[in-house]
């Protein structure tokens, strides 16, 4: 297993930086918008959903 071969310092670096790298890549590709993700759920529009 690749993760078992890593040192503790390498695992900590990965845990610290991978989320930032994924977010940056997603922003470049237009798959994820930070401002939209931070809005409260009740502000999102879900067409076809019924309000009770």
Swiss-Prot record:
<dbReference type="GO" id="GO:0007586">
    <property type="term" value="P:digestion"/>
</dbReference>
<protein>
    <recommendedName>
        <fullName>Gastrin/cholecystokinin-like peptide</fullName>
    </recommendedName>
</protein>
<dbReference type="GO" id="GO:0005576">
    <property type="term" value="C:extracellular region"/>
</dbReference>
<comment type="similarity">
    <text>Belongs to the gastrin/cholecystokinin family.</text>
</comment>
<keyword id="KW-0372">Hormone</keyword>
<comment type="function">
    <text>May control digestion processes.</text>
</comment>
<keyword id="KW-0222">Digestion</keyword>
<dbReference type="GO" id="GO:0005179">
    <property type="term" value="F:hormone activity"/>
</dbReference>
<dbReference type="InterPro" id="IPR013152">
    <property type="entry name" value="Gastrin/cholecystokinin_CS"/>
</dbReference>
<keyword id="KW-0964">Secreted</keyword>
């Amino acid at each position: 297993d690749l993760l078992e071969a890593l040192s503790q310092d390498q695992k900590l670096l990965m845990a610290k930086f991978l989320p930032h790298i994924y977010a940056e890549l997603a922003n470049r590709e237009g798959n994820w918008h930070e401002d939209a993700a931070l809005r409260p759920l009740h502000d999102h529009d879900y067409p076809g959903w019924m309000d009770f």
